[in-house]
Amino acid sequence: MQPVTIALAKGRPAKQTIKLLQAAGLTFEELDATSRKLVFYNEDRTARVIFLKGMDVPIYVEKGAADIGIVGKDNIIESQAEVYELLDLGIGKCKFSIAAKQGVTLSSDNEITIATKYPIVAKRYFSKRNQSIDVVKLNGSVELAPLIGLADYIVDIVETGNTLRENGLEILEDIETISTKAIVNKASFATRSAEIQSIINRLSTVVG
């Protein structure tokens, strides 16, 4: 039988996730967040961890290439993947927020321009406000957009807000708090329920 495959977001998020796995007694040979390896097996090879870009984790899980994924809610929302969310791991907590240049207020007008790495989040939020928006999809340095006139506002993930303040921006409104989730492929949960639930249960004991 194929090992249960657990997809992790590589890079900085992996360090916290690996600590959780280890605390839950889930150990994998040579598993290290800084390793260039992408696949790690447990001792009896009944489970394996794979490292992916965060945005790809929900896709691998949805398509069945991974049974379980541990990834930020931001990536789950933006991927629009059809998966089960089984557990909030309580790590990687931050907020989706709307920000603009200091002194600017949040307009209720239509056709405002939003710069963001998260167009799904932005469109969903402003749709609830019955506002039509023009979204500029960026991949980095979102804070720059209002400063040079590319956008009226930004929607971004905020932890401390220091980067915004250093660039003359301020938070106008928080959209929602997000954190790291354990997600599961729907078919896998039906066919490998005992194995998957065992892993989820072990994780749940260390996250309270």
Curated annotation (Swiss-Prot):
SUPFAM superfamilies: Periplasmic binding protein-like II. Its main location: cytoplasm. It catalyses: 1-(5-phospho-beta-D-ribosyl)-ATP + diphosphate = 5-phospho-alpha-D-ribose 1-diphosphate + ATP. The lineage of its organism: Bacteria, Bacillati, Bacillota, Bacilli, Bacillales. Belongs to the ATP phosphoribosyltransferase family. Short subfamily. One of its GO terms (molecular function) is ATP binding. PROSITE patterns: ATP_P_PHORIBOSYLTR (PS01316). GO terms for cellular component: cytoplasm. Heteromultimer composed of HisG and HisZ subunits. CDD domains: PBP2_HisGs (cd13595). GO terms for biological process: L-histidine biosynthetic process. This is ATP phosphoribosyltransferase. It comes from Oceanobacillus iheyensis (strain DSM 14371 / CIP 107618 / JCM 11309 / KCTC 3954 / HTE831). Keywords: Amino-acid biosynthesis, ATP-binding, Cytoplasm, Glycosyltransferase, Histidine biosynthesis, Nucleotide-binding, Transferase.
